[in-house]
Amino acid sequence: MTRREFAFGAAALASAGCMSAGLEVKERNAADGIKVRFLGSGAAGWDPKWLKEKPNIRRPSSVLLDGRVLIDLTPPALDMLPEGCVPEVLFQTHSHGDHFNPVAAVKSGVKKVYVHESWVVAAREAVSAAAKKLSLPSPEVTGLAFAKSVEECGLKFTGVPANHSTSRVTDGVLECPSMYLVEKGVTRLLYATDTAGIPADAARMIGVDAHITAGNYAKYAKSGSFVAPPKALSAIIMEATNGDSDTDFRMFVHSSVQDVARTVEVLRSTGRYLPPSGQCAYITHLGLKYRDWPSGRIDAELPAGMRAAYDGLEVVFFNG
């Protein structure tokens, strides 16, 4: 199934809310929000061959931000890029094959690739080899330390640690998977996959640990330079690989729907997640539990304030 065959009607471009499609877009200036296109919303295990056989099949998880920046990319997701779109930058969460594919990175035409500094050498070698094989220009591959920020295409990216593992070791250094805080003006979006919950250090790096308040921030800042002052998130995209199971053996490296729901509620109740009225948190990286399920059926079983992403969905996230 190609992007041209992928029809979503009026819901294809909606506000990131649980209201009627397009309502928030009409009431807000889209230039102030972060536009997200889900190129893929599935976990590992979905067979690309299924794309031609039936609907509701998910490509490996990947997003396109503001039509210019990618987070993760694999060959099946290339077909979901809008017609004529040539992304400029690619941020990688980790090196698992359902997220990182050097051939896809080179074919996409991006000029820069960011990875965590722990595996930058391996990433450079892989991307360079793919470019040579394809006889195409090789993107520049840059290592990014946790809590350090870079600005690309009008968006600010901060890498923070994910609770995940690849077991990749390069020159004695263990790879550290990443999540990303994406900021545009006052809008703050957390893209969290793959991860089992939000690690404490990540929460402190993006200012959402409720232990830290305006009153005691100075004390925490002295103990660790990576600690950010308290600041609420505007939007959340988080993985729910384990579906509605809280006993899945992957619980140590992946999240469930309940994990995401608890995360959203705790952040909301502590003032660390303040979306606009009607704006939902989205789950992605869905496992085979949801094979053959349309997103509407998944949404019907999700807690209030949450929705399931699907391939080709476009939403615009705003600050509250």
Regions found by a protein language model. Give the residues of each.
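Flexible, active-site-proximal loop/turn residues at the rims of small-molecule/cofactor binding pockets
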Residues: 12, 96, 119, 242, ...
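Short, aromatic/basic amphipathic alpha-helical patches
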Residues: 123-136, 293-305
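Active-site metal-binding motif and surrounding structural segment of the metallo-beta-lactamase
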Residues: 68, 72-121, 232-236
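N-terminal export signals
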Residues: 5-24
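Cap/insert and terminal regions of metallo-dependent hydrolase folds
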Residues: 198-313
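Structural beta-sheet core signal
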Residues: 90, 190-191, 283
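Core dinuclear metal-dependent hydrolase active-site scaffold
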Residues: 25-85, 143-229, 312-320
